[in-house]
Amino acid sequence: MLAETQLAPIAVIGDVMVDRYITGSVSRISPEAPVPVLVHGAERIVPGGAANVAANAAALGAPVLLVGLVGEDEAASQLADALATYPGISLAHMVVDAKRPTITKTRVMSGRQQIVRIDAEVTRACDAAEEAALIGAAEAAIAKAGVVVLSDYAKGVLSDAVIAAAMAAAKARNVPVIVDPKRRTFEAYRGATLVTPNRRELAEATGLPDETDADAARAAEAAGRQFGGDVLVTRAEKGMTLWRQDGRVLHVPAEAREVFDVSGAGDTALAALAVSLAGGQSLEASVGIANAAAALAVAKLGTAVVTRAELRAALERTAAQIAPPGALVSREDACAVVAAWKAQGLRVVFTNGCFDLVHPGHVSLLEQSAAQGDRLVVALNTDASVRRLKGPSRPLQDEQARARVMGAMRCVDLVVLFDEETPLETIKALLPDVLVKGADYAPHEVVGADVVTANGGELVLVDLVAGKSTSSLVAKART
């Protein structure tokens, strides 16, 4: 996703804004009223709202088709100039209406302290002509897009009709839709792949708390039932919680970082999520990438973008901290590590097995697997999984012992356990570039092969060492 590859365009549709920052110094109180006197220092203009999502997506290397509503005014020109600094953003689908001013939020700052915010906006619903123009623009952008983002700030652009048209256009092309919501309930977003409320938005939509991970999962489930899709809750210092329609839940802790400003951090996370999905990452891995991007954003002052180089470096640091070579990690941590490897352009290979008594046949399989790419992930059946497959007398070595042996193999970079009878859910979460199994399987028999190939990966069947198996070793030892 962060490697130098061509990404599918991202259509960002929503409420675009101008964020103006006036900075200066304060050393006294006005004699006219009990307010500080700011000595003007500088001003800067940056994209805000949906435009900030577009800027962040472009900074991460994605082509962007921006759909929004601006006026015929100086603020619109300033926004266009600010967006022009990010190569890859197309404004061809923007709608201009002289009757409506461009939304502008002016923040007056002294150092890192915000003194006041001044909003210049009209939040009335769009009239029929504006709505028709927005629908046409959205449909045209979605026709070219690989991912659709609806950035809803409740400023009038994303009406029921515009949302419905966007959902229909995306469904017709089988394009995923991510929504950053601003409504009190999420029914209007029916058809979305994923909705990403923050804690306040989730509470308003469900009336449920999110203090604990279990609370957040229950509230996310209630929200997901409203529109029929997955829910990612951004929980500030508590990290992120992903609830999926099949009942799976993923909790990602927040990365420890000094927080300077939360302005626009949600936009940054949303953009990183969309870019990651456009790059072929799984949703689970994309959540980890979005979490890392948000951590970088809050360390910056004001509405800011996170660049591809910054995010790649952060992911590399995270991967090194989580998993030294051969480490046994959770599925969630494996997602983060694999995402970091892919961000570096590394080719990730996956194989799996019980690996109870390691023999030359296993070694050959692992060596041939490692030769297919740059990093090898080995998924091990847990003890319970092995017993279900091979009977109560197996495994001979427990899962921790087997994982340690695997991790000591110099060709193995990461070890992850799975408790199911097959590694399908792990494959779906990691989405490796190459899936390797022995040549005793037919391609249609390999679990997860369809998932990997549908994502642009490949299945490789490697030769086995004749006469070498754990079962034969066990039988020989018992005679």
Curated annotation (Swiss-Prot):
UniProt-annotated stretches for the region Cytidylyltransferase: 350-479
Organism: Azorhizobium caulinodans (strain ATCC 43989 / DSM 5975 / JCM 20966 / LMG 6465 / NBRC 14845 / NCIMB 13405 / ORS 571)
Record-linked SUPFAM superfamilies: Nucleotidylyl transferase (SSF52374), Ribokinase-like (SSF53613)
GO cellular component, one term: cytosol
Record pathway: Nucleotide-sugar biosynthesis; ADP-L-glycero-beta-D-manno-heptose biosynthesis; ADP-L-glycero-beta-D-manno-heptose from D-glycero-beta-D-manno-heptose 7-phosphate: step 1/4; Nucleotide-sugar biosynthesis; ADP-L-glycero-beta-D-manno-heptose biosynthesis; ADP-L-glycero-beta-D-manno-heptose from D-glycero-beta-D-manno-heptose 7-phosphate: step 3/4
Pfam families found in the cross-reference section: CTP_transf_like (PF01467), PfkB (PF00294)
UniProt-annotated catalytic positions: 267
Protein name as annotated: Bifunctional protein HldE
Assembly and binders: Homodimer.
The keyword Lipid metabolism is assigned to this record: no
Keywords for this protein: ATP-binding, Carbohydrate metabolism, Kinase, Multifunctional enzyme, Nucleotide-binding, Nucleotidyltransferase, Transferase
UniProt binding sites for ATP: 198-201
GO BP of this protein: ADP-L-glycero-beta-D-manno-heptose biosynthetic process
Region (Ribokinase): 1-322
Reactions listed under catalytic activity: D-glycero-beta-D-manno-heptose 7-phosphate + ATP = D-glycero-beta-D-manno-heptose 1,7-bisphosphate + ADP + H(+); D-glycero-beta-D-manno-heptose 1-phosphate + ATP + H(+) = ADP-D-glycero-beta-D-manno-heptose + diphosphate
Family matches, as InterPro entries: Bifunc_HldE, Carboh/pur_kinase_PfkB_CS, Cyt_trans-like, PfkB_dom, RfaE_dom_I, RfaE_dom_II, Ribokinase-like, Rossmann-like_a/b/a_fold
E.C. designation(s): 2.7.1.167, 2.7.7.70
EC top class, as a word: transferase
Domain of life: Bacteria
GO MF entries: ATP binding; heptose 7-phosphate kinase activity; heptose-1-phosphate adenylyltransferase activity; phosphotransferase activity, alcohol group as acceptor
Family membership: In the N-terminal section; belongs to the carbohydrate kinase PfkB family. In the C-terminal section; belongs to the cytidylyltransferase family.
Task performed by this protein: Catalyzes the ADP transfer from ATP to D-glycero-beta-D-manno-heptose 1-phosphate, yielding ADP-D-glycero-beta-D-manno-heptose.
